[in-house]
């Protein structure tokens, strides 16, 4: 199982991908243009996921991420976790946000995958 933190904006998403040990495998920004984002997730599926393996994604709730939530299912996303946006601070960056989201997901993976609640997180079945 892989753990994907996504910080989403209108023109790009910033991604932090962790493995089962919590190590960051990939941190990058991807355009939200359909060709670019589909290219990225095709490559992720092809190069990072073994047969039958899937990933779990976490992203902040926003008014324009419904298309992304639906699209993740096409690329073997097992579950999507939504979180309320974190308070803004001076050292907030897209990369830090994506890394913090993937870490939050990885730290709570046992409870989340067992379907148990985690305060502040809402699971979405896709």
Which residues does each predicted region cover?
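Phosphate- and other anionic-substrate recognition elements at nucleic-acid/protein interfaces
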Residues: 1-126
């Amino acid at each position: 199982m892989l753990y994907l933190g996504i910080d989403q904006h209108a023109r790009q998403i910033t991604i932090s991908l962790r493995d089962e040990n919590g190590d960051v495998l990939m941190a990058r920004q991807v355009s939200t243009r359909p060709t670019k984002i589909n290219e990225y997730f095709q490559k992720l599926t092809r190069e990072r996921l073994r047969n039958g393996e899937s990933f779990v994604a976490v992203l902040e709730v926003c008014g324009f991420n419904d298309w992304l939530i639906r699209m993740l299912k096409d690329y073997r996303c097992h579950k999507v976790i939504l979180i309320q946006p974190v308070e803004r601070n001076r050292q907030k960056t897209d990369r830090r946000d994506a890394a913090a989201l993937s870490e939050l997901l990885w730290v709570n993976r046992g409870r989340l995958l067992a379907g148990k609640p985690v305060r502040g997180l809402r699971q979405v079945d896709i």
